[in-house]
């Protein structure tokens, strides 16, 4: 997401209007720290974990045992982490968001990942899996379990999704006017790939009276900088090429709203506990008068 902001501020926008496929080139640079973990599947009766290097093949067969090199990559959201298994997950350009365990009914892999304690949400990309954790959870405890789940699942040969599904939000429809078509084109060809590099996705919801409504997914859904990304990155880019766009707004679905309510309730309970623990205690253990 930081790439979109720096791109909009860095003067990389060409002084041309967006037509058909005339879209801006995104300035890309490596900003994320990466880790490599070599796992030997427990299906192959081994649980060895070794440090690997970027040049090591992602998937190989050694002495009849299936091994996988899983790469981890930080995201702008400290509560989200990308896992790159070195093999295709959903295929180029495809994503699937699982904001809660209830949404994982169509994916055996997502169900298994939600069983890992501390996992809050799961997101599948073309060749990566983004895990978002609870704030109190620690990556040091979550990562080994996620590694094991991914390794065992890919060794099993089970389908990742019960039903194949392509992203349809940017598909050009018969009733789309020129403005909507240009918005979808720019989102699909330049903005979405950049956001997916950060372990998330951006979904077109609607356009009406100059307002573009978008939904953030994956690491971007709860990222502290998501609003800044929308305003300083996505909105500026859309407005430059499509003057009809007046503003960009983020929308939330029911799962997002429920998660926010649960978090607010959790915070209130913590504050109440803190207040009761610091209150003066009288004789007999009751509050002092």
Curated annotation (Swiss-Prot):
Gene3D superfamilies: Fe-S cluster assembly (FSCA), Scaffold protein Nfu/NifU, N-terminal domain. Transmembrane segments: none annotated. One of its GO terms (molecular function) is iron ion binding. Residues 267-289 are annotated as: Disordered. GO terms for cellular component: mitochondrion. It is found in: Mitochondrion. Residues 1-56 form a transit peptide. InterPro entries: FSCA_dom_sf, Nfu/NifU_N, Nfu/NifU_N_sf, NFU1-like, NIF_FeS_clus_asmbl_NifU_C. SUPFAM superfamilies: Fe-S cluster assembly (FSCA) domain-like, Hypothetical protein SAV1430. It holds the Pfam family Nfu_N. Residues 183-251 are annotated as: NifU. Keywords: Iron, Iron-sulfur, Metal-binding, Mitochondrion, Transit peptide. [4Fe-4S] cluster binds at residues 220, 223. GO terms for biological process: iron-sulfur cluster assembly. Belongs to the NifU family. This is NFU1 iron-sulfur cluster scaffold homolog, mitochondrial. It comes from Drosophila willistoni (Fruit fly). The lineage of its organism: Eukaryota, Metazoa, Ecdysozoa, Arthropoda, Hexapoda.
């Amino acid at each position: 997401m930081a790439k979109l902001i720096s791109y909009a501020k860095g003067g990389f926008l060409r002084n041309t209007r967006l037509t058909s496929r005339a879209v801006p080139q995104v300035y890309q640079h490596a900003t994320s720290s990466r880790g490599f973990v070599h796992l030997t599947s427990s299906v192959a009766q081994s649980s060895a974990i070794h440090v690997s290097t970027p040049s090591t093949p992602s998937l190989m067969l050694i002495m009849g045992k299936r091994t996988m090199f899983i790469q981890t990559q930080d995201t702008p959201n400290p509560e989200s982490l990308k896992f790159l298994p070195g093999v295709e997950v959903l295929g180029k350009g495809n994503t699937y968001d699982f904001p809660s365990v209830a949404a994982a009914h169509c994916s055996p892999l997502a169900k298994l990942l939600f069983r890992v304690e501390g996992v809050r949400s799961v997101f599948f990309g073309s060749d990566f899996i983004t895990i978002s954790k609870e704030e109190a959870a620690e990556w040091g405890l979550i990562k080994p379990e996620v590694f094991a789940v991914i390794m065992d699942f890919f060794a099993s040969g089970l389908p990742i999704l019960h039903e194949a599904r392509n992203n349809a939000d940017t598909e050009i429809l018969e009733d789309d006017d020129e403005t909507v078509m240009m918005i979808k084109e720019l989102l699909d060809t330049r903005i979405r790939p950049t956001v997916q590099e950060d372990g998330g996705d951006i979904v077109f919801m609607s356009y009406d009276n100059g307002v573009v409504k978008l939904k953030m997914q994956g690491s971007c859904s709860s990222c502290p900088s998501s609003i800044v990304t929308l305003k300083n990155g996505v909105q500026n880019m859309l407005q430059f090429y499509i003057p009809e766009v007046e503003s960009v707004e983020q929308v939330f679905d029911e799962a997002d709203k429920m998660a926010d309510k649960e978090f607010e309730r959790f915070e209130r309970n913590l504050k109440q506990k803190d207040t009761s623990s610091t209150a003066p205690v009288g004789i007999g253990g009751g509050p002092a008068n």
